[in-house]
């Protein structure tokens, strides 16, 4: 019997097969490895396990058989210059996924929570099919795995995409425990550092050439549901279109929670919509540079929120008397245009999903896309989507273009002297019913889209207070709705609740307090944000006694709006408030002057 065996050795440059024998010593085997990979004898290390345990040393006189290395085993080679396996190697087993991915990254709280859950679908005893006692189990009542396709297909409505954590359980299940599986991010670029030839376009080899991509409909999704906390959040966003007829754009701020309708599912809960600077028309949107973007993210983080997605309108009135809108996005046209898919892919690349199971420390994205558009009943509907990881890679590496005259089609770029683009294919059915492979020039974008259910809760949730006279939303100057101290004074005069926290708990108001140019409170508002986040009235009362709120009151009193409830929110005594109410602001330099003076103490100009 021949004792020759083949051992696979994985390095950062790929996997190679080494022919050896069972009785061969470790030193002899390592010499073969060094020759095959082009290393010096001491320029690398070989391990049995990916986490750098079980090193095979040249000083060992043991045979491969005694080292329990069998035919077909996979060993791991690390050059001496590499600090660790996580920078280049792929993930393998379920234990290995945790140890050999990116152990230093901190995943989102929802991912940490779901990774510890059982996830199995428990079923009760079937009185007709089960023939055992109440404590027994059979094939009709044994718990199902969270990725069971038959169970997902029989839900109402059926679930086409399993959750991401269910997908992880599927990869790490089975006899091999995911030994040959890797959460690998797709790359469409030529690998750098290949010294065997001239750089592109003068040379390329199979070592540095990216693989061709065959588009498949993604079987899993990173987010399974989008839920707006209440109708007011969405209605205020739609008010812009109702008043102007122009399309509008916004960022969704909220949190990720467990979606219990799907095994190990994730829900994106939307608490507020921030509207950045933009130019909208009836059929187009242009985003402008937002100097406040980082500040908004910081304030949201202190409120326990984060940017979870983006939303835009695509609404056209059909009958203004009935209040109906046109039903334009359907199976006969498109659900997302190629341009929107590229935009969604760009947003998802900017907001990657932190994942310790990937060598890169991230895999996919939980950033969602919401569209306010007409439904089959000609009423406004909210639809949710993501684009696949393949689409993210094509967008990130600038390989995908939109089609100008066909919004439902994209176009994979062709290679040029400046950029190599791998071939992109998709599978289709021809007129004879045969499955054929087509080059993605053009490409139906339906291969890139993942649909997500979008809902409103039966019992509304309110992270922020709801007012009959809310504070104006930012960047709506075109409507005559501006954020200034006059609008703040008007808001305070119309909201005279005795609970200060209810009055101040408005996302757009808090942003104004931080970002206004007259009296920005970015350095002194942390206590108030903590009060809003925890719904703590005592903390809010403590903050309202600060000098900052007293100054805000003084500025509001100079705009000519009576604040009947000002005494409830003031931070000083009654006599001080009386003196403050008599102070006046110079119309020329805004200096606050003492009562009884007719000229400004700062610029000496008359009061009127």
From Swiss-Prot:
Coiled coil: none annotated. PROSITE patterns: MPN, ZF_RANBP2_1, ZF_RANBP2_2. A zinc finger (RanBP2-type) spans 580-608. It comes from the Eukaryota. Disulfide bonds: none annotated. GO terms for cellular component: cytosol; endoplasmic reticulum; nuclear outer membrane-endoplasmic reticulum membrane network; nucleus; UFD1-NPL4 complex; VCP-NPL4-UFD1 AAA ATPase complex. One of its GO terms (biological process) is retrograde protein transport, ER to cytosol. Signal peptide: none annotated. Pathway: Protein degradation; proteasomal ubiquitin-dependent pathway. Binds ubiquitinated proteins via its RanBP2-type zinc finger. Belongs to the NPL4 family. The ternary complex containing UFD1, VCP and NPLOC4 binds ubiquitinated proteins and is necessary for the export of misfolded proteins from the ER to the cytoplasm, where they are degraded by the proteasome. The NPLOC4-UFD1-VCP complex regulates spindle disassembly at the end of mitosis and is necessary for the formation of a closed nuclear envelope. Acts as a negative regulator of type I interferon production via the complex formed with VCP and UFD1, which binds to RIGI and recruits RNF125 to promote ubiquitination and degradation of RIGI. This is Nuclear protein localization protein 4 homolog. It comes from Mus musculus (Mouse). The gene is Nploc4.
């Amino acid at each position: 019997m021949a004792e020759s065996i083949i051992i696979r050795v994985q390095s950062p440059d790929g996997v190679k097969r080494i022919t050896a024998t069972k009785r061969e010593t470790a030193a002899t085997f390592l010499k073969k490895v060094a020759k095959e990979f082009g290393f010096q004898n001491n320029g690398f290390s070989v391990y049995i396990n990916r986490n750098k345990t079980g090193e095979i040393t040249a000083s060992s006189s043991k045979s491969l058989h005694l080292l329990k290395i069998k035919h077909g085993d996979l060993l791991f080679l690390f050059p001496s210059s590499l600090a660790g396996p996580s920078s280049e190697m792929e993930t393998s087993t379920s234990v290995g996924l945790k140890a050999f991915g990116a152990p230093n990254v901190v995943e989102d709280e929802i991912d940490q929570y779901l990774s510890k859950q059982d996830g199995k679908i428990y079923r009760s005893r079937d009185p007709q099919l089960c023939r055992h006692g109440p404590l027994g189990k059979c094939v009709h009542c044994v718990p199902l795995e969270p990725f069971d396709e038959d169970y997902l297909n029989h839900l109402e409505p059926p679930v086409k995409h399993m959750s991401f954590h269910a997908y992880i359980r599927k990869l790490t299940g089975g006899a091999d425990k995911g030994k040959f599986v890797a959460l690998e991010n797709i790359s469409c670029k030529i690998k750098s550092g290949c010294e065997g030839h001239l750089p592109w376009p003068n040379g390329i080899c199979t070592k540095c050439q990216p693989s061709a991509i065959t588009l498949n409909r993604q079987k899993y999704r990173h987010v399974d549901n989008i839920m707006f906390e209440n109708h007011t959040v969405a209605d205020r966003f739609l008010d812009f279109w109702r008043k102007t007829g122009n399309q509008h754009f916004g960022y969704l701020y909220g949190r990720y929670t467990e979606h219990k309708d799907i095994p190990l599912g994730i829900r994106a809960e939307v608490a507020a919509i921030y509207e950045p600077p933009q130019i909208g028309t009836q059929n187009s949107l242009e985003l402008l540079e937002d100097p406040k973007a980082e500040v908004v993210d910081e304030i949201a983080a202190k409120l326990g929120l984060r940017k979870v997605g983006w939303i835009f309108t695509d609404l056209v009135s059909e009958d203004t008397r009935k209040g109906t809108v046109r039903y334009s996005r359907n199976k006969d046209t498109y659900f997302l245009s190629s341009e929107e898919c590229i935009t969604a892919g760009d947003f998802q690349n900017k907001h990657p999903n932190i994942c310790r199971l990937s060598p890169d420390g991230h895999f996919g994205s939980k950033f969602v896309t919401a569209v306010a558009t007409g439904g089959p009943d000609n009423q406004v509907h909210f639809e949710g989507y993501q684009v696949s990881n393949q689409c993210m890679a094509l967008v990130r590496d600038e390989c995908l273009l939109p089609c100008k005259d066909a919004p439902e089609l994209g176009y994979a770029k062709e290679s040029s002297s400046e950029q190599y683009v791998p071939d992109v294919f998709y599978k289709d059915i021809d007129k004879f019913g045969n499955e054929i492979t087509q080059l993605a020039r053009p490409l139906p974008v339906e291969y890139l889209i993942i649909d997500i259910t979008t809902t409103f809760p039966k019992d509304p949730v309110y992270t922020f207070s709801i007012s009959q006279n809310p504070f104006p939303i930012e960047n709506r100057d075109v409507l005559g709705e501006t954020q200034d101290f006059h609008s703040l004074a008007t808001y305070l005069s119309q909201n005279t609740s005795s609970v200060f926290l209810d009055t101040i708990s408005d996302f757009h108001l808090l942003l104004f307090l931080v970002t206004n140019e007259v009296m920005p409170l970015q350095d002194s508002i942390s206590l108030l944000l903590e009060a809003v986040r925890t719904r703590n009235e005592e903390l809010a009362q403590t903050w309202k006694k600060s000098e900052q709120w007293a100054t805000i009151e003084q500025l509001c009193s100079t705009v000519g709006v009576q604040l009947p409830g000002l005494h409830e929110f003031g931070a000083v005594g009654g006599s001080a408030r009386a003196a403050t109410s008599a102070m006046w602001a110079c119309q020329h330099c805004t200096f606050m002057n003492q009562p009884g003076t007719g000229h400004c103490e700062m610029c000496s100009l008359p009061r009127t």
